Structures are given as structure tokens and as C-alpha cells.
């Protein structure tokens, strides 16, 4: 098992896991912890991944390759009050396999702060 720690600040989407560049296109996530560390405000969280899937329009014609990106939400506009943590555990079966993908988090406000801990099996 390995752990990924991230301190997220602001409302710009941040990449948490990137199989495009780390070369690991099959990871199983045991858990994801999200903690709102802002002193006074709640935060709305989007947690989602992009899956890159190559599409071939003609068999054996590699010139006609087109990559399509699919977006799948794990959380969408979930409000976390100040000082509260939420835990997404493996009972949700976060198994990201068989493809290139990026896992993202996006917060609702420019001064939002969230700590993320991802436990990879």
C-alpha cells in the first residue's frame, strides 16, 4: 500500500492521480479522505476522473485513431463543513483499471482548503 498526500487550495481543478505520466494504468484505491481545513467556511467538493479511451473507426487503420475523454464523478457538489472530514472507503470499489486516466478534485471557492489522503492498495 502507498499513500498520496495533497494540500488543495483554491477553486482550480487539481490532478490527484495521473496514469498518463506515472505509467501505472491499473490502481485500486482503498480509501480517500477529504478534510476541510478552512477556519470558517464550508466547501463544496467535486471529485471525478477522466478516462482516455482510444477509438478506432476502421479496423487496423491506426491513422483514424481518436482519443475520447469520458468524465465520471465520484462526488459532485458535496458540502463539507469547516473542520469536518469525510472518508470514502473501498466498499465503494474505486478500481481505476484498463486505461489512462486522471483523478481530479475541484473546490468551490478561491480561498477553500482541503487536505486529501489517498490510500492505494
Segments (PLM) and residue ranges:
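Intrinsically disordered, low-complexity Pro/Gly/Ser/Thr-rich segments with frequent PxxP/GP/PP motifs
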Residues: 53-102
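Short solvent-exposed strand-capping/beta-turn motif centered on an Asx-Ser/Thr pair
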Residues: 34-40, 108-110
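Detector for Asparagine
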Residues: 7, 24, 36, 60-61, ...
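A structural signal for the main folded, soluble domain(s) of proteins
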Residues: 20-23, 33, 80, 91-92
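C-terminal interaction-tip segments
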Residues: 1-27, 44, 49-57, 97-121
Amino acid at each position: 500500500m502507498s499513500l498520496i498526500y495533497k494540500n488543495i487550495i483554491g477553486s482550480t481543478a487539481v490532478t490527484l492521480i495521473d496514469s498518463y505520466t506515472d505509467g501505472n494504468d491499473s490502481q485500486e484505491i482503498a480509501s480517500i479522505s477529504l478534510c476541510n481545513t478552512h477556519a470558517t467556511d464550508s466547501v463544496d467538493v467535486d471529485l471525478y476522473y477522466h478516462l482516455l479511451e482510444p477509438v478506432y473507426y476502421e479496423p487496423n487503420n491506426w491513422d483514424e485513431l481518436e482519443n475520447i475523454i469520458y468524465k465520471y464523478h465520484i462526488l459532485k457538489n458535496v458540502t463539507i463543513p469547516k473542520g469536518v472530514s469525510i472518508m470514502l472507503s473501498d466498499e465503494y470499489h474505486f478500481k481505476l483499471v484498463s486505461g489512462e486516466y486522471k483523478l481530479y478534485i475541484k473546490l468551490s471557492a478561491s480561498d477553500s482548503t482541503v487536505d486529501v489522503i489517498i490510500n492505494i492498495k
